[in-house]
Amino acid sequence: MLDKDRVLSKLDELDSYLSELESVMPKSYEEHVSSIEKKRSCERLLHILIECVIDVCALMVKGLRLGLPSEEEDLFEKLERKKVISKEMKERLKLMRGLRNILVHRYAEVDNELVFESLGNVNDFRKFRKEVSSFLRKLEAA
């Protein structure tokens, strides 16, 4: 059974971290690269936000009994098939997961331009929240 309270709690966490990120986001690329503190804060908050999104996805897949995912990307596929998230959001989540892997595992030296560009996509977190919340409301109405 889907634990809506837990999902909503995670979505509230998402909002909190998003506010934090927006409070430290640089206004320009130059500001981003010139302040190691800002740069690292943004990287870490992006990482936490993406982990939060993945947690919500895992809770939804488990709670809706959509089957065991073979990998994280499978979470997104299952949620799109169930119409929890849109196809566009599924693709955005795949990109987020890729960024998370770069930030965490440092597959390559973290590209300042990639991180700065990702900061311009913070609205994706709001869209994700909106899509999940909308699905939860539909479940309640059913």
Where are these regions (language model features)?
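Solvent-exposed interaction patches of small proteins and small membrane subunits
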Residues: M1-A142
